[in-house]
Amino acid sequence: KLLVKDDGIIAGIEFAKQVFTYVDPQIKIEQLIKDGDPVSYGDIAFYVEGASQSILKAERLVLNAMQRMSAIATKTNTFVKLLEGTKTQILDTRKTTPGIRALEKWAVKIGGGTNHRFALYDMVMLKDNHIDFAGGITKAIDKTKSYLKENNLDLKIIVEARDLDEIKTILKSDGVYRILIDNFNYEDTKT
């Protein structure tokens, strides 16, 4: 059985089922709770039945993944709850642990967050260096839109803002999907 050792949001049950089944298709799993459910110390997530060698072979990977995923889902859910009633979403980052990005981003979704970008290829992000090199925000956005059109690419544009004036400039531009606020203090984010 998988015994829950802390309160939080459980994550990684579907992954655990895949691992156990991959190691031994004869393993039987009785699932009692699902990914995203709130759990408390002492809850049982599932029972596993099968050859002890197969269970032990999969056990450490399952436990490590579920601990990490549940921690991420729990932390994400804490912030999601704080923002209930607003239009604000919790987004994850592309900066993840090498080799387990998919699991970490899956955990964010389980916790109620939204995936930002999976990799460099799925959105265009204009950072401060790009903006400076292009000669300003408006020029950077216009050049990016032209490039996307010329190359028949359907990618969303995200622009990083360093201050409130840059946000105002970005908001006047057409075609920006998201604004990334960089190192803003709490008071500035409320503005």
Name each model feature, range by range.
Residues 171, 180-191:
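Short glycine/threonine-rich loop/turn motifs
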Residues 1-173, 190:
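Acidic/glycine-rich phosphate/pyrophosphate-binding loops and surrounding catalytic core
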